[in-house]
Each structure stands twice: as C-alpha cells, then as structure tokens.
C-alpha cells in the first residue's frame, strides 16, 4: 500500500508538471526610465493568456486575454504596463519608462489544449550612474554624480575647498554635487574625479574668464538699456506734463459798465431828490402861511 501511494503521488506530480510546463526563473534587468519587454512561451492554438505581476511594493497587477471572446482585461495595472501589441498574435508585455516600483516577479501563463505553460521573470531596475561637469552662471566648475543606493565620492585636481552636497531621491538614487572653489589652478583646467562601485570617471573643464566677461558684458548692456528706457519714460512724462501746465489760461474778465446802466442807477436817486425837494417846498409854504397875519398872502 505504501508503495502504491507513493506511485500515485509521483504520477500526480508528473501530471501537474506536464500540465503547467513551468520554466525556470528568468532574471532580467532594465535601466531606470527605459522601456523593457518580456515575452510568453510560444504555443499554438492558444485559448487564453494571462500576465500576473507581483511587484515588491504595491498590489498585484493582472492582464488577461481570451481568444474565444476576443476580449482583454486589466486589473490594478499602471498605464505604463500593457501589451506590446495585439495580444491575439503577440502576447509580449511592455513596460514603458521603468521605475524602481516595477521591480518584482512577472509570470506569463499560456493555455491551450496541451495544458498551461508558464514563463517566470524577476525584474531588477538598474540606475545607470551618471556624471556631469559644467560651468555655473558665475563661471565656476560644477561636478555632479548620480548613482544608486550609496553616494559617489567627488574629488578635484587641483584640490577644492568646497564640501559636496548629497541629495537622496524617491527612486533610490543619490545625487552628489560639488563646486570647484580653489583659489588658483596654476594654469591647469580643473578636473573632477568620481569614484563609485558602478562608476569611475574623470573629466576636465575650462571655465575661462571669457565666459565671465561675456556674462558681465551682457549684464552691463542690459543695465544700460534699462537706464535709457527709464530716462525716456521720465522725459516723456515731463514733456507732456509741461504741456498741460503751460496751456493758455482763459483771460480775466473785466466787468464793463454801459452808460445805460449808469443812467438806470442814477435815475432812482434823482427821483428821490426831486420828491424830497417837493415835500420840503410844501412844508415851507405851509409854515409861512401860518405865520402871516390874516388877510395877507405870501409873496410869490
């Protein structure tokens, strides 16, 4: 019985292996920011294809295609992860602009009448080291080195007095920046030396004084143009302001009096005087008559 049980187990195991036809794990790598493609087992008369993605961080992603219904499905997958072409004739998976979060295990399962066939991948994202040497806006040499995980070491020839600055990023890279700050180069071009497990590179640069002279010349010209423009605006405002100030004022209006107005003003006074005289004469005559003896009349 024990031997029969073992035989059954072996038979079942062989059947499962035959049906699943799983291959070994294929280790692949992709450069950060580049595209990568993974293919499925080549089989005929496929009825269904499924990609199962298990990243180190995040949720599982699934892409599926059914031949009989000519339909595709996508679950929890980024827009960057998709079929390379039409899945009915090309079942390859393409990842655009690979990031560190895409690291993990990728499995393609192909189903046909002969069984299920698998191909497994383990994706590793590589950050290619990068070195850059340039002159800043002040004509000083600047050296940059971008590497993965550990920071690179930067040194200068001649020796520089500056301290490098290291910045860590979310994608797992570290950027080191160093400014050349030596007092004298003895006529030699500054040389930047980058040391790292994945990068050993040396570059030289000449940030000559002509570069700084060019910047200074441009600054002087711009300043001169700004001053000229400012003076022109002031002159324009002053010119138009004086025009408004010197506009001819309306002449002072001198009141004029006509002889008719004088006559109108004098006539009331004359009438008044005449009335006074008449009243005075009447009173005088009455008084004189009262003082005369009876029978006499005042002389005229």
From Swiss-Prot:
PROSITE patterns: IG_LIKE
Gene Ontology process terms (BP): regulation of neuroinflammatory response
PANTHER family for the chain: CELL SURFACE GLYCOPROTEIN CD200 RECEPTOR 2, CELL SURFACE GLYCOPROTEIN OX2 RECEPTOR PRECURSOR
Stretches that traverse the bilayer: 214-234
Bridged cysteine pairs (disulfide): 40-108, 143-192
Molecular function terms, GO-annotated: signaling receptor activity
Domain Ig-like C2-type: 122-206
Highest taxon of source: Eukaryota
Cytoplasmic side: 235-300
InterPro entries in UniProt: CD200R, Ig-like_dom, Ig-like_dom_sf, Ig-like_fold, Ig_sub, Ig_sub2, Ig_V-set
Species per Swiss-Prot/TrEMBL record: Gallus gallus (Chicken)
SUPFAM superfamilies to which the protein is assigned, alphabetical: Immunoglobulin
Glycosylation sites: 45, 76, 105, 171, 200, 206
Keyword field contains Cytoplasm: no
Post-translational modification: Glycosylated. Phosphorylated.
All ranges on the Extracellular side of the membrane: 25-213
Family named by the database record: Belongs to the CD200R family.
One cellular component (GO) term of this entry: extracellular region
Coiled-coil features, chain-numbered ranges: none
Pfam families: V-set (PF07686)
Domain Ig-like V-type: 25-124
Protein's name in the database: Cell surface glycoprotein CD200 receptor 1-A
